């Protein structure tokens, strides 16, 4: 059996007993050795391609192939990670207790103020609730958490079970809001609504648009105020971005939703500009805010020195203030000057090393420039929930011969790591131990990390973590 990833002929062909891919860049025979017995392999063939042959991208945005155990999340999980960083809100899960395991530390967002968002709340539906309905239990739960915590808002998340039994989430939330005077927001996030958790991201954005944004006025308006959309303050990333804009003379009104409050998000419609971390859900929210409130938006990326510099200049150029532009250039010069020597030291060991990325759709291409600044080469990039536009971005950023993968299973990922032998894998915690057991260094760039990677200082942190992972002596000893 021969697997051919050539875009002119993606069909399964009969051949000898060894499995291989026919490519301009030949991939060794053993990549899918352990997958021979899986009938679903044919359906997975088109979800991998090699950049540079033409403008092709992997088949994506589809149901996971039956029998291939992937690591995707659900729609509820997608909604939860977007809204969870709102620090003074209660996040109440209407469903079985197991769904409440998706809590604040799934994304690890940090806060300078309220810590209420770190508490977990669930209606803990039981068998009798499934039979007789859970609306009464939900109503009583909302009243109880409001009495105990007096939150800025209560987000109520619907789960699969609730969608099946037909509880009227909106009606209960409306009644509870009238009874408590607290903002009670339904999030119709039944997990089975889509195979792709990004549908949950959009539902979370809709909840903010329908019930939060535009409902309050800011304490004061600033002529150069911005919102940062798609920044969730994982490991304190936001705190490496805000000071840079403040030095330029720009006021960051709020991030949506990292380290935010209900009041800040509610008054975000008065900001003069939205800057958008390039994720599909973030672009959707920015587009809706422009349509509804006339706020323009620009895309930014704070991973790496060059991308951070571009993001600062883009905002200064948007406002067109000559003094701001001058301050921005002075700031950029000062920041890079202070980091140049340290980066050079890391590059001595990292130059020429190879990297595999299996992460969120945005990071799978946004990190390419950052690794280029360390003279490292991307040889594989993939994501679990990428859309066509995400893979187009990956294709446009990586070098010819890079393998691009959609929705890889653990077995596939292990085989690809063994064949490509990258010097480091950049991914999340779910892939961490696959990498380490394969003898390949790992860097966590997803929600579980504890080190900030955004902005200028964040890039130094990133380079240090990558350098430490690659140069740890255990890898040299284990390979012997």
UniProtKB/Swiss-Prot annotation:
Keyword annotations from UniProtKB, A to Z: Nitrogen fixation
InterPro entries reported for this sequence: Nase/OxRdtase_comp1, Nase_comp1_CS, NifE, NifE-like
A GO BP annotation: nitrogen fixation
Keyword flag Cell membrane: no
Function recorded in the entry: This protein may play a role in the biosynthesis of the prosthetic group of nitrogenase (FeMo cofactor).
Family to which the UniProt record says this protein belongs: Belongs to the NifD/NifK/NifE/NifN family.
Name this protein carries in UniProt: Nitrogenase iron-molybdenum cofactor biosynthesis protein NifE
The organism of origin for this protein: Methanococcus maripaludis (strain DSM 14266 / JCM 13030 / NBRC 101832 / S2 / LL)
């Amino acid at each position: 059996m021969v697997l051919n990833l050539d875009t002119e002929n993606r069909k399964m062909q009969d051949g000898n007993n060894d499995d291989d891919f026919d490519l301009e860049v030949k991939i060794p025979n053993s990549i899918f050795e352990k997958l021979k017995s899986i009938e679903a392999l044919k359906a997975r063939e088109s979800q991998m391609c090699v950049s540079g042959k033409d403008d092709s991208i992997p088949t994506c945005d589809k149901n996971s192939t039956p029998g291939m155990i992937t690591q995707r999340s659900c729609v509820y999980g997608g909604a939860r990670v977007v809204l969870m960083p709102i620090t003074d809100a209660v996040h109440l899960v209407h469903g079985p207790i197991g769904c409440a395991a998706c809590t604040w530390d799934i994304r690890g967002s940090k806060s300078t103020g309220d810590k209420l968002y770190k508490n977990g709340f669930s209606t803990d539906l039981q068998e009798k609730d499934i039979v007789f309905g859970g609306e009464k239990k939900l109503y009583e739960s909302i009243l109880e958490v409001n009495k105990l915590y007096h939150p800025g808002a209560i987000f109520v998340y619907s789960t699969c079970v609730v969608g099946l039994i037909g509880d009227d989430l909106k009606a209960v939330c409306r009644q509870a809001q009238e009874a408590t005077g607290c903002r009670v927001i339904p999030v119709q996030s039944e997990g089975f609504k889509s195979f792709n958790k990004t549908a949950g991201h959009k539902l979370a954005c809709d909840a903010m648009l329908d019930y939060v944004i535009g409902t309050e006025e800011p304490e004061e308006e600033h002529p150069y105020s911005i919102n940062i959309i798609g920044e969730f303050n994982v490991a304190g990333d936001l705190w490496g971005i805000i000071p840079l804009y403040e030095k330029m003379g720009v006021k960051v009104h709020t991030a949506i939703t990292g380290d935010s409050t209900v009041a800040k998000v509610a008054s975000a419609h008065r900001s003069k500009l939205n800057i958008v971390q390039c994720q599909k859900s973030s672009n959707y929210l920015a587009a809706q805010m422009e349509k509804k409130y006339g706020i323009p938006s620009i895309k930014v990326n704070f991973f790496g020195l060059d991308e951070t510099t571009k993001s600062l200049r883009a905002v200064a150029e948007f406002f067109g203030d000559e003094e701001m532009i001058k301050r921005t250039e002075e700031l950029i010069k000062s920041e890079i000057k202070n980091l140049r020597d340290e980066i050079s030291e890391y590059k001595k060991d990292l130059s020429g090393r190879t990297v595999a990325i299996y992460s969120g759709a945005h990071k799978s291409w946004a990190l390419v420039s950052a690794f280029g600044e360390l003279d490292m080469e991307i040889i594989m990039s993939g994501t679990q929930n990428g859309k066509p536009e995400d893979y187009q971005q990956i294709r446009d950023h990586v070098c010819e011969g890079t393998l691009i993968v959609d929705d890889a299973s653990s077995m596939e990922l292990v085989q690809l790591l063994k064949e490509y032998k990258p010097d480091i894998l950049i991914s999340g915690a779910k892939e961490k131990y696959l990498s380490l057991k394969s003898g390949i260094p790992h860097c966590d760039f997803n929600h579980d990390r504890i080190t900030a990677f955004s902005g200028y200082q964040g890039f130094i942190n990133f380079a240090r973590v990558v350098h430490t992972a690659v140069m740890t002596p255990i890898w040299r000893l284990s390979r012997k």
